[in-house]
C-alpha cells in the first residue's frame, strides 16, 4: 500500500469486497470487518451479473474467473395467467451491445472469487461485528462486539439494508441537530413484497441459456439456468403489511406453504413450478425492502450498496449497482490522493461528490425496479395492460429498458477499458422518468424503429388518456 490514508470497510459482501479491490488498485490501505464467520456462506442465493457490473469486474481482472462459472443467458420467455407467452432476445441483445453476457451464478461462488482474487487477504477479518463508531478530529474509531477497536481516516458502510454505519450516521445527525428528532430513518422505504429464492438441480425440460418467467396476479416466478444442471429461481409475492413480521420470524414454514401452493403454476408449456420445487436443494424467504435512503454520509462516515438503496431483484441491478458504488467512490478517492494528502475538509466534499454522482442514477434504477416488480405481479390495470398487451409486441423493448439503465453506468476511470467493452451502446445518458420508453427505441432493430415508435406513441396515448386515473 502506497498511501497513508486508511479506510475501514464494514461488511465483506459484494459492495465491501468490490471496494477492497478498487482500493487495492490505487494503493489505499484498508481493512474489511465482516460480522459473519465466513466471507462466502451458502445461503441459497444467486447473483445476476449484468454488463455494467461485468465491465467493472473486467477492469479489475476478475471477470474471466466469473465467466468460467456462468451459463450466459440468450433469451427469456414471459408467460401470463391466460397462457399467452412471448420470447425476448434481450439477454443476447445486451451481450451484443455491451460486450458482456447476462448471467447468473451462486452468490457464494461469486463472493469466493472476489475474496480469492484479493491480494490483501490479511486485511479481511471475519467475526467482527461493528457495534459503535466514534469520530475524532482527525480519525474515526470502529468498535467491534469482541471489544477490539480499529482506527482509520474514514469508515464505509457496505453492511446491507440493516447497516450499523447508516444507523451511526443517523445518530450523529440527530445529536448535531441536523435532522429532526421526529424524522424516521426508514421513511423512504416500502415493504410491499417478499422474495423466496432457491436453487434446484436436474430440473427436466430446461434449456440452457433461457430465462423463464411466470407473471401472475400478485406473484411472479423467475428461473435462470446455471452450470452443473443448477437452476436458480426466485418467487416475488405481494405481502400484506401485517404478514411481514411472520415472514421474518418463521420464513421457512411460510416459504414452504407458499411454494406448495404454487406447484401447479406453469412456467412454460412443458414445465410446472412443482418440477422446480420438488428438486430444490436450498431455499430462503426474506422481506423485500424498496427505496433509497435519504442520508448517505456524515463526517467521516459514508455508505454504499444496499446500505443506501434497496430494490427488488426483477431488474437484476442490486449487486451491479453495489459494484458501481465501490467504483464511483474509488474514482473520487483516487483523484483526491493524486493531488496530495487528503485534508479533513476534503473528506466531506468527497462524500458529497459521491452522492451527487450516484443519487440520480440510483433513484432512476430503483424507480425502474419498482415499476417492473409491480408490472410482473399485474398490479394496477395500467401496468397489467402495458405488460400483457403492449410490451410483448414491441420486440426488443425489454432489451431497450435494460439497455437504457446499463448505458449510463459508472466505470473505473483510472484503469483502461477492456477491448470487449468498447462498444457503441455505452455512454448514452440516463435521465430516468418515462423517457425510458422513448430511449428504448435506440436498442430496437433500425428497420422496426419507425413502426414501433408510431405504434408505441399511439398505444401509450390511448392507455394514458383512458386509464391514467387508474394508476396508483
Swiss-Prot record:
**Enzyme class of the recorded protein, top EC level:** oxidoreductase
Q: In which pathway does it act?
A: Secondary metabolite biosynthesis
Q: Which residues of this UniProt protein bind FAD?
A: 34, 48, 107, 306, 319
| Record-annotated disulphide pairs | none
Annotated membrane topology: Multi-pass membrane protein
Mind telling me which InterPro entries this protein's record contains? FAD-bd, FAD/NAD-bd_sf, FAD_mOase_fung
Q: What EC number(s) does its UniProt record assign?
A: 1.-.-.-
Cofactor(s) listed in the protein's UniProt record: FAD
Q: What induces it?
A: Expression is down-regulated when the stress-activated mitogen-activated protein kinase (sakA) is deleted.
Q: What is its main location?
A: membrane
Glycan attachment positions: 186
Q: Which GO terms describe its cellular component?
A: membrane
A molecular function (GO) held by this record is: FAD binding
Q: Does the keyword Heme apply?
A: no
State the compartments where it is located. Membrane
Q: Does the keyword Methyltransferase apply?
A: no
> Record's family?
Belongs to the paxM FAD-dependent monooxygenase family.
The function of this protein is: FAD-dependent monooxygenase; part of the gene cluster that mediates the biosynthesis of lolitrems, indole-diterpene mycotoxins that are potent tremorgens in mammals, and are synthesized by clavicipitaceous fungal endophytes in association with their grass hosts. The geranylgeranyl diphosphate (GGPP) synthase ltmG is proposed to catalyze the first step in lolitremB biosynthesis. LtmG catalyzes a series of iterative condensations of isopentenyl diphosphate (IPP) with dimethylallyl diphosphate (DMAPP), geranyl diphosphate (GPP), and farnesyl diphosphate (FPP), to form GGPP.
> What name has this protein been given in UniProt?
FAD-dependent monooxygenase ltmM
